[in-house]
Amino acid sequence: MNIYSVQAQIQRRAAALLHGKEQGQSSWEELDGRQLADDERGDRISLLLGGATGGVALSPASRAGLLAKAGTGTLFLTHIEKMAPAARRILYSIVAAKRYTPVGDPYPRPVNCRIIVATSRPLQVLARSFLLEWELVDTLGHIALRAESIIGALESEGLLNSHPSSLAAAS
């Protein structure tokens, strides 16, 4: 699902409402694409998303990638248009295959989390402007919602208190 708005705070609020974060439901992980603007080989995104299983010096918590930490919750990605092309290709391959393999682990694991992408404009507009690859846009889906509209709809008492996470399950 793509949430677009020019204000990051509004995007985060809309994503949190879709996730049901305020009710303390499933886990929530975030990744800011600006951190990966210089990840020319895609090494850092591989470790951030997939994590590493080996290594004695690392604590178990530091080895888990964002996908493992998110579990069946939500992975909230911001500024993916700012990621290096190699980092976006790795993101695409993980989302398209719906599985990932942590570093040092021979067995792939399924991606079970909901992925919400926050951008300043809809993904299709970014692809037409050559800021994103069409393959990634097609894989992330064609559901594009304006953040302000989500907040307006979900903050009405009856809808928000019913089942906010079921609304995002279709994403």
Predicted regions and their residues:
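Nucleotide-binding/hydrolysis machinery
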Residues: 5-14, 18-26, 104-114, 120-171
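Hydrophobic/aliphatic anchor position in the core parallel beta-sheet
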Residues: 74, 100, 115-116
